[in-house]
Amino acid sequence: MSSYNYLNEKIILPISDTLLGNSIYKDLKFLMNSQWWSADELKEYQNEKLRALIKHSYDNVPYYNELFHSLHLTPEDIKTSKDLYKLPILTKDILRENIKNGKIIAKNISKKSLLLGSSSGSTGEPLQYYNTRDAESFNKACAIRGWYWMGYRLGDRYIKLSQNPRPLLKNIQDKFNNCFYISVQQLTDENFREIVEKINNFKPLFIRSYPDPMLFLTNYIIKNHIQIITPRAIATTGNILFDEYREKIENVFKCKIFDSYSCEGGANVSECETHNCYHSSMEYAITEILDNDMNDVENGCLGRVITTDLHNYAVPFIRYDTQDYIKKSKEKCNCGRELLAIDKIEGRDSDILITPSNKWLIVHNFTGYFEWIDSVEQFQV
């Protein structure tokens, strides 16, 4: 760790936490230790957090109090993650309705302290919900830990490519974080030329982006025979990173991609340095991977992601249906971490076709087929 990295992690981050009321530094320090816990230690931590969450939800959240009574359950009936099957799945529609009527918002948390969060809306109407400062800090710390797996340290020079407008506070934070933010709202050849110029001039150690803009930028570089600097790594998130995308981007930038996935409700997953799998942040949420009958899938199988956020006490997400599918790893990762190992992020339920014989076809199946047919420029299933 350089002196500049040390300054950012050990001094600037704690000062920022104090000024903004966050706890990212404390949480990151905890997570850098807990990532090496045994599976039993991780599950024990989850169960302890789950019991506290269930009691809080029963005592302070009308929706869950009514739900428990209707099921003739008490908080004592949910002692470990294995007991979660006793509770129904929380769908986005149920959540949206009960946020609107206020029944799923905790009564014992000041409205002034609530933070507004929102899903991307990629599958329809965005979901707006509330979060606590502590939960948001823990989530950010999990994301930073994932970046650390690719060799990043706070203060390292990086470029972020994104479509979102950058508010003043974010611009100020970018300066402190050594981040050069580049908007990719308009993807034209002229914009790509400017982006390449900015990347080459800034010489980032890391690049963060959605997969699609990185692919389009890569295609532009290939088409125009342009020289591009080689960062240490590229971090992608936000939509599916197809194998052919990864291969093409890595070949052009001559570095590895570290993919990640997150979703409202506690899903926070990052690819580790072995590139053999992703790891779910078990300290942040309980992740169930279920089949169509809502039973646990076997290792190596595809399943629906159901999450229980162990930290958001404002609007508890308990057995939340993310509508995403992931493939559970067959084996433990050889990185040594016993965090839940995931082979692939497969996409939304709207991206999966189930045949009459109950065979699941994901977007990858069609992409891999049509990429070899030159006459097909675009396709939609």
Identify the function of each model-found stretch.
Residues 144-186:
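Conserved AMP-binding loop of ANL adenylate-forming enzymes
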Residues 123-125, 154, 263, 325:
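Conformational gate/switch positions in structured elements
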Residues 1-118, 125-139, 144-149, 153-156, ...:
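Nucleotide 5′-phosphate-binding alpha/beta core
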Residues 86-90, 167-169, 268-271:
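Short, solvent-exposed polar/charged micro-motifs at secondary-structure junctions
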